[in-house]
């Protein structure tokens, strides 16, 4: 049920239905905490749960234009994930920080974060394309948007950004 409510959060947040998005996120977090209670003393699971909670809260704040709040939650994500010995540990932080920076009008800064993020995350590649377009790299943006628009697989990230990418390509 935690995953189902997380999916509801994603749906409502991307449709700018704030109360329902928040309710779904809170329920998803609560259900995840209940699941964590059953794991008892698993420090890695607890760390991941804390990081994921901060990440999802940051994402929600970003989607509703509360960038300062998003940055506060992302600082928590950074403090947790930078201690993980993995080359991918900071991907989520960097991708979402890139999105926040872009939405604040800081496209150059956004690109620096996107370069350190997951290069295969379609959702954030869309925002990277927006940042490239904002700094005048229309060819770079077009390449990413074309890849997104021509992808024929089905997954939630693509469902959110594919039609948006197609519209941007039509206006280029």
Label the predicted regions.
Residues 100, 105-118:
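Generic long, charged, amphipathic alpha-helical segments
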Residues 1, 32-42, 81-89, 121-127, ...:
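Boundary/linker segments of alpha-helical solenoid repeat arrays
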Residues 3-7, 49-52, 56, 60, ...:
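"A position-specific structural signal for the A-helix of alpha-solenoid helical repeats
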Residues 26-30, 75, 118-120, 138-156:
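TPR/TPR-like (Sel1-like) alpha-helical repeat modules
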């Amino acid at each position: 049920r935690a995953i189902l409510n997380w999916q509801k959060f994603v749906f409502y947040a991307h449709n700018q239905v704030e109360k329902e998005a928040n309710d779904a996120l809170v329920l998803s977090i609560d259900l995840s905490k209940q699941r964590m209670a059953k794991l008892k003393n698993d420090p890695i699971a607890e760390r991941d749960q804390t990081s994921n909670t901060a990440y999802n809260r940051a994402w929600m704040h970003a989607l509703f234009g509360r960038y300062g709040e998003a940055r506060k939650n992302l600082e928590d994500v950074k403090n947790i994930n930078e201690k993980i010995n993995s080359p991918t540990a900071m991907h989520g932080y960097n991708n979402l920080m890139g999105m926040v920076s872009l939405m604040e009008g800081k496209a150059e800064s956004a690109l620096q974060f996107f370069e350190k993020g997951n290069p295969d995350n379609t959702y954030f590649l869309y925002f990277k394309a927006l940042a490239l377009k904002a700094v005048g790299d229309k060819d770079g943006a077009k390449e990413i948007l074309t890849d997104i628009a021509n992808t024929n697989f089905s997954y939630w990230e693509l469902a959110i950004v594919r039609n948006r990418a197609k519209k941007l390509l039509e206006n280029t």
